[in-house]
Amino acid sequence: MKPVPLILLLATVLLSSHIPPSVCRPRDLAMFDGHGYKSQLDEVLLKAGDNAISYLIGEKILRYLQRNPRLQAGLPPQFPFEVTPLGSRGLGHLARSLPPLEEQRAPEEGNSLEEFVELTKRNDDPPISIDLTFHLLRNMIEMARIESQKEQAELNRKYLDEVGK
């Protein structure tokens, strides 16, 4: 390959691989909404930008807070509308704004911490889509490796039987 096309190909790949995904997102989604209102999910996604992990953590914390009305009383009234990407500063601010659980824990609410830990655990559901494809591929490779080991062991037994006679 000549150097000029190689340099152009390399420059194209490097330039296109460093475009942030937020450049491709629309700025205003109101034109797609018939009522002129943005849904809270769209607003959160726009604010989250490229930080999907912080969005997922924030979503889990929000679900946990919505399930426990006692904890909602200690939050500011505008809290559900102030959903922003939670980085280390955001999680620290949220942790400081929540009242300590040990002070307010009643005997019937002893499982709330366990429920929160359970929310953060990964599901045991089978993987979907591309994860399932790679999972099946790994299983097939493992089965092929085991089969080849069995065949090799059988050949080794035959060789030992021949040499032993």
Swiss-Prot record:
SMART domains: CRF
Pfam families named among the record's database cross-references: CRF
Signal peptide: 1-18
Subcellular location: Secreted
GO molecular function terms attached to this record: hormone activity
Keywords, alphabetical: Amidation, Cleavage on pair of basic residues, Hormone, Secreted, Signal
One GO CC term, this protein: extracellular region
Gene3D superfamilies: 6.10.250.1920
PROSITE patterns attached to this UniProt entry: CRF
Domain of life where this protein originates: Eukaryota
Family per record: Belongs to the sauvagine/corticotropin-releasing factor/urotensin I family.
Function: Urotensin is found in the teleost caudal neurosecretory system. It has a suggested role in osmoregulation and as a corticotropin-releasing factor. The non-hormonal portion of this precursor may be a urotensin binding protein, urophysin.
Protein name: UI
